[in-house]
């Protein structure tokens, strides 16, 4: 703590000696990080292929969603593990009530406010909550890293901004820039080609392998972008905001939100906050009996996308092999009392 206080004092004295300075390091100075622009396009394209592949797989592999909580299950019959925490769960002994799931239940991404100018106006206030659009956080991260979308315009600078006594000042004149239009066309064209190549595949196993590859490609690319571009999450609720600062919209309803007047408690986000993995129970035998509540300590888990692709024929990834507990042999239901 003493070192942090000393560093803060030194930075304050440096600002007094040089009140007007040009920010040099992107993206803090309003410019893009050149080496991350192609990564952003790869992440965006991988997300489009992922959604296309999952939409095909859910037509063959059923997805079950609890009516009262966020529990998800991949399989023809929902599991019998009593973990429901939704309304009326006490009357049902925490048993889930299953309904048919959708694509966005498998690939869930929280929404984030879209920032037109991430440096000049990095924060959305409460009165602007109805006017500023909310888009998936992974898409907003790609836009801030260099992806240009016609539906969600953003300001691109060619000169760095200045900091005058801690305030960001932009001396660049506003002018129309049409350099991004060909890039939009190229992006749409490449995405269409990827979707067409995906649609031409009829083998379920090939679709599952391609879908899982796009999942890992999206995750790895997003991690690289998050090293430079800030992503914040609330410490009490799942709200996510992509940008250097968190928004001021009073919408938090988690623990002690009354003491914070509904404001979020922002902290640095991880990849799981940006792209929720949504862990589900791993089913070894899709044609067997439902997962038993008494045997839940013998079952493993995996992200919903991974479990869906594995049941469709994709090989089990090495990084999730131990989590799925493939080396554990669960006993039969009549052998529970005989196992230590």
Question: Which sequence ranges carry the predicted segments?
Answer:
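Cys/His-rich zinc-coordinating modules
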Residues: 1-56, 92-239, 245-340
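Core mature regions of organelle-targeted
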Residues: 39-42, 54-68, 84
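Short Cys/His-rich zinc-binding micro-motifs
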Residues: 64-77, 231-245
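Short Cys/His-based metal-binding microdomains
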Residues: 78, 88-90
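N-terminal helical oligomerization/adaptor modules that nucleate signalosome assembly
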Residues: 60, 70-75, 81, 95
């Amino acid at each position: 703590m003493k070192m942090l206080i000393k560093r803060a004092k030194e930075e304050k004295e440096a600002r007094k000696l040089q009140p007007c300075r040009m920010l040099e390091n992107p993206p803090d100075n309003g410019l893009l990080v050149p080496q991350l622009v192609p990564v952003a396009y790869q992440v965006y394209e991988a997300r489009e292929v992922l959604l296309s592949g999952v939409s095909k797989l859910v037509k063959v592999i059923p997805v079950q969603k609890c009516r009262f909580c966020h529990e998800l299950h991949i399989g023809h019959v929902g599991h019998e593990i009593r973990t429901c925490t939704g309304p009326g769960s006490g009357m049902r002994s925490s048993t889930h009530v299953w309904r048919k799931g959708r694509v966005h239940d498998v690939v869930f991404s929280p929404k984030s406010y879209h920032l037109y100018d991430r440096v000049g106006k990095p924060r959305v206030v409460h009165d602007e909550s109805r006017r500023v659009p909310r888009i998936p956080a992974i898409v907003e991260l790609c836009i801030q890293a260099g992806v240009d979308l016609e539906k969600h315009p953003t300001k691109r600078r060619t000169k760095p901004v200045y900091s005058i006594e801690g305030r960001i000042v932009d001396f660049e004149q506003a002018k129309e820039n049409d350099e991004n239009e060909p890039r939009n066309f190229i992006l749409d064209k490449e995405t269409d080609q990827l979707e067409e190549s995906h649609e031409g595949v009829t083998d379920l196993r090939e679709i599952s392998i391609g879908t899982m590859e796009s999942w890992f490609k999206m995750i790895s690319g997003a991690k690289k972008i998050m090293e430079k571009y800030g992503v914040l999450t609330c410490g009490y609720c799942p709200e996510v905001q992509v940008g250097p600062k968190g928004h001021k919209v009073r919408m938090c309803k988690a623990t002690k939100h009354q003491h914070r007047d509904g404001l979020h408690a922002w902290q640095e986000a991880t990849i799981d906050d940006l792209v929720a993995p949504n862990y589900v129970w791993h089913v070894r035998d899709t044609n067997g009996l439902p997962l038993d509540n008494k045997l839940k300590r013998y079952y493993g888990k995996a992200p919903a996308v991974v479990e869906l692709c594995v049941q469709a024929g994709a090989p089990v990834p090495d990084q999730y092999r131990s989590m799925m507990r493939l080396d554990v042999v669960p006993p039969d239901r009549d052998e529970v009392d005989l196992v230590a």
